[in-house]
Structures are given as C-alpha cells and as structure tokens.
Design a protein with these regions (language model features):
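Single conserved hydrophobic/aromatic residue that forms the stacking wall/gate
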Residues: 1-5, 10
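Anion (oxyanion) recognition and catalysis
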Residues: 16
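Switch/coupling subdomain of P-loop NTPase systems
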Residues: 80-109, 119
Length: 224
C-alpha cells in the first residue's frame, strides 16, 4: 500500500531481464493507502513494466468495501465482523455492479467513484495481453488484504490460470531431460542451509520440484 521498495526493485528487475512473469498483489487495502492509480504508476516508472489491474479497490482503510473484478464484472464485498485468534473475520459476498444490494454497501460517493474509475480503466488503461504477461512486460495487479485473507484466493486462482506450465529441466550430471509431467518425483536442490539451530546438527535442503508430486512426510534420496 506504499511505494515500491528497493528489495522489490532488485528482484523484479531480475525477473524483467529474464522475461519472467511478474504478478503484483497490493496488500493492506483495509488500511489507509495511496491512490491506486499512483501505485500502478509507481510500479511502471520504477520497474519499467506496464500494469493491468485485474480487480479494483473500492475505498481504503476504514472505508474499504471490497474489490471490483474486471473479468466477471462483479463486486467482491469486504465486511469485517470482529476478530478470531487475533485475525479479522471477513465475509465475502459477490454482487453485480448494478445490484441494488450495493446501495446498502456503498455510499453514493463511493458508488459513483467506482463507476467513474472503471469507465476510465476500460477506456484508457493498458489492454490485457497474455503474451506480454508471459514475457514479463505486463504485470497483472490485484488488490486485497492478506491479513484477512481477502482477495488472496482470486489472486492464486488467476496465478494458476495464467502462468505457464513448468519447463523441462536438463540434469547437469547425466544430461537427461527431466519431463515435468512424469510421475517419478525429482527436484533440483539449489541451496543447503546447515546449523540453523546450534542445539542440533541440522541441514535443510531448499529445492525446486522438477517432476512428480511432493507429499509431506515423504522420503527422498539426495544423489550427492
């Protein structure tokens, strides 16, 4: 909900140089936030990529009422009804943009602001182009609140729908091409961290799955 940080700049510039798709989730909309147009402009100027808002916030902070899904043309309403275990409980309900139920959710000002901003986005904003997304030239942008888990599920669903399938990997030792669709589990170990707890001789391997399915509790053999 603030401006782009230096760590994000470095990471995303590497993604841009390597043409890796970049998906953006603008968090903490249930707190006071900057203007969403300003946030997208900030991303475009600093990271050098275009943006396409997949949904659009309705208000922010105490006035945050939800998001408008530009694909389904529906409003996903945000309503907090207290806390459970320190985390806000949130009810999510869908409503059409012209649904009379929105009159109960939105003030006349917020309703008109939403209509005006959606018209502006539909008429003047960048068009969605999946090829540009896959080349790392266009970033789909989502708004929500991770703490309350609001807007996270649509983000993940679109991420799975839009991102490409895993690429085949060539084994550096054998030269074998590992098909990501084969059933046998295999993974590339890119980092081993040791002695994180001085009371134990621990070693944790960080890996990228190349084929098969990882299941919690399974045993895997490290070839090295």
């Amino acid at each position: 909900y603030g401006l782009v940080g230096s760590e994000m700049c470095i990471r995303d510039r590497v993604c841009t140089l390597r043409h890796i798709p970049i998906f953006t989730f603008i968090n903490k909309m249930d707190r006071e936030a900057r203007d969403p147009f300003e946030l997208m402009e900030n991303i475009e100027e600093i990271l050098g990529i275009k943006t396409y808002p997949m949904n659009w916030p309705i208000g922010c902070g105490k006035e945050f009422k939800g998001v408008f899904d530009r694909n389904t043309r529906k409003v996903l309403a945000f309503s907090s009804d207290g806390r459970a275990n320190g985390v806000k409980k949130v009810d999510e309900t869908e409503a059409e943009l012209g649904d009379p139920a929105l009159d109960e959710l939105l003030t006349p000002y917020l309703h008109q602001q939403l209509v005006d901003e959606i018209e502006l986005l539909d008429g003047a904003a960048e068009e969605f182009d999946l090829d540009k997304v896959l080349r790392g030239e266009l970033s789909p942008v989502f708004f929500g609140s991770a703490l309350t888990n609001f807007g996270v599920e649509p983000f993940l669903e679109n991420f799975l729908r839009l991102t490409p399938t895993p690429l085949a990997r060539v084994d550096s030792l054998t030269g074998e091409t590992v098909d990501p669709c084969r059933d046998e589990f295999s993974a590339f170990i890119f980092k081993i961290q040791a002695n994180m707890n001085k009371a134990h001789r621990d070693r944790i391997a960080f890996m990228r799955i190349c084929s098969g399915k990882f299941e919690r509790g399974m045993e895997a053999f490290h070839v090295q």
